[in-house]
Amino acid sequence: LTFSTRSLLNLPAVEWKSGAKYTCTASHSPSQSTVKRVIRNPKESPKGSSETRKSPLEIMESPEDYGTEEDQLENVNEDSNSSLSIMTFVILFIL
């Protein structure tokens, strides 16, 4: 399993050219870890350009942060078993 997030940050060219650093921090509630990336201008903008640059930041998280595939399937099976038990109880109660 692979998870990804894409974020789009619009910056004025003046700020981008200055070499300012921007930090993006992301976390997922079941995960104990936090992903943190620092981005900056990899190369200078065209001279005289006042356009806003768009810089996509892609964060790839490790599937280990969310447990193994077997752990995830086990959680799904537990949820399915609970739903089945509840439905069985309701049907028997109505009869």
From Swiss-Prot:
GO terms for cellular component: immunoglobulin complex. Residues 61-77 have a biased composition (Acidic residues). InterPro entries: Ig-like_dom_sf (IPR036179), Ig-like_fold (IPR013783), Ig/MHC_CS (IPR003006). Expressed mainly in lymphoid tissues including spleen, epigonal organ and circulating lymphocytes. Also expressed at low levels in the pancreas. Residues 1-36 form the Ig-like domain. Glycans are attached at N81. Residues 41-56 have a biased composition (Basic and acidic residues). Keywords: Adaptive immunity, Glycoprotein, Immunity, Immunoglobulin, Immunoglobulin domain. Transmembrane segments: none annotated. GO terms for biological process: adaptive immune response. Residues 24-79 are annotated as: Disordered. Residues 24-35 have a biased composition (Polar residues). This is IgNAR transmembrane form NE.
